[in-house]
Amino acid sequence: MIDRRAFLKSLAGLTTGVLLSSACAEGDEENSHSDRLGSLLPTRRFGRTGEAVTMLAVGGWHIGDMDEAEAEKTIETALEGGVRFFDTAEGYQNGGSESRLGKLLVPKYRDDVFLMTKTRARDTNEAWEHLEGSLSRLNTDRLDLWQVHAVRNPADVDERIENGVFDVMIEAKETGKTRYIGFTGHSSPHAHQRVLEKTDIFDACQLSMNLADVSYESFIERVVPTLVERNIGVIGMKALANGGFFGGTQHGRHGPNPKVVPNRVSISEAVRFVWSLPVSTLVTGPDNADQMQEKIDIAKNFTGMADDERQKLIEKVEDMAGTTVEFYKA
């Protein structure tokens, strides 16, 4: 039986390496904190890539979901606040999110940002089709990171490997269509474990990380240690359980959900918990520019968590662990 307190203490200790290496990746600590657009949020080392990425990233699904005027305001707010990592996927709004970034972000800021998208492809042909479509919609000839999107379980992983999807990822990197490759998922840590059993081709991994995760089918416990050991860049997501922490019936799967925020923990505490782990960046999905600014302010004022604070927060939501709050887990 895992000693959770000791495990989290050891894992949190590894965060120092992520933080201290960011300046080295840029070569100069002072220069790593600004670019032509202004001051950056703190940066963190992105695994073995040698990159230093901002600790906060903009979630592309939300950019595609809001109206265009609010999307533009949110993007500009993110850039002004020092965010330089942008997430999207071909499956978000059937390419609508990518098209929006291709219109509002890329023309003016392509060389200033780290641009990532994802593919749900099931076979070789579909993977190439998705890649070319993504590049076209994003209005660019290269990606910074292209990821296998939403691996669900070991069988799903095996199918994508057998059908050549992983081979396409390798070729896309070798031919310069993407600088780095990765994989994502939030259904089951066993899917991620399967990927890591089968291959070591990936530079990055995106996975669910939040206070409730620790107590049920935990990505933090089952996957993150291997990522750190292999020097794979860790991209956190769902710090607020994709809205599950706010309760209500918005997800339509399990009826009324218990409310975690603000009844038990604050948004700041939930986000700080993730940043206190060895994560390179955290993808946040703002519904509007004000929410984007809220996360930026939390990042600017971030301080690490002591072991006791971390454990107390976990215990506050431990009874909510499972698929009601984390509705996306299998």
Regions found by a protein language model. Give the residues of each.
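C-terminal segment of N-terminal export signals and the immediately downstream linker at the start
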Residues: 23-56, 64, 73
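Glycine/proline-rich, positively charged
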Residues: 122-218, 222, 228-235, 290
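Structured C-terminal cap/extension of enzyme domains
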Residues: 14, 198, 222-330
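Acidic (Asp/Glu)-rich catalytic clusters
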Residues: 47-50, 102-110, 135-140, 196-199
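Glycine-rich, proline-tolerant flexible connector loops at the mouths of alpha/beta enzymes
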Residues: 88-104, 153
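N-terminal secretory signal peptides and thylakoid transit peptides that target proteins
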Residues: 1-15
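Conserved, mostly hydrophobic/aromatic
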Residues: 46, 58, 86, 101, ...
